[in-house]
């Protein structure tokens, strides 16, 4: 994975721990789900985010893109990854507050649409060049 993709992936993981902890504390532990079945729950919740952001599950994306290596997030724009990170945090909040998966999907999709409109309207789409500039500035300080 090149530096640009690495930076984009790290950005997408910012709220990952908050998200997975909410799943564990509010779904896995209370329902006494086995370790084997827990991975299915985590994957299902990841797909809630994928559908809210990209309109398809990871499996659907792989089926539509058999020639591409990696996953849907590896090919996302930086602005989409920023939005996805925000959605992870929002989903954790909704899980903590007992909101069901279908209702969360609706709210997450609304939030994704709203955020992406802001990025487009305000011309705030981030580019890899911005990321590289920020990284270079941090190194030079």
Regions flagged by a language model, labelled:
Residues 1-141:
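Positively charged, phosphate-engaging catalytic surfaces used for nucleic-acid and nucleotide handling
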């Amino acid at each position: 994975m090149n530096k640009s993709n690495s930076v984009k992936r790290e950005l997408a993981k910012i709220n990952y721990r908050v998200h997975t902890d909410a799943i564990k504390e509010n779904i896995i532990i209370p329902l006494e789900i086995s370790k084997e079945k827990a991975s299915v729950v985590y994957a299902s919740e990841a797909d809630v985010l994928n559908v809210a952001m990209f309109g398809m599950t990871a499996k659907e994306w792989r089926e539509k893109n058999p020639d591409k290596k990696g996953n849907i997030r590896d090919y996302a724009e930086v602005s989409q990854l920023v939005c996805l990170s925000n959605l992870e945090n929002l989903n954790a909040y909704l899980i903590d507050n007992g909101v069901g998966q279908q209702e969360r999907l609706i709210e997450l999709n609304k939030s994704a649409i709203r955020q992406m409109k802001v990025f487009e309207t305000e011309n705030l789409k981030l580019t890899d060049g911005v990321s590289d500039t920020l990284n270079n500035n941090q190194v030079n300080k």
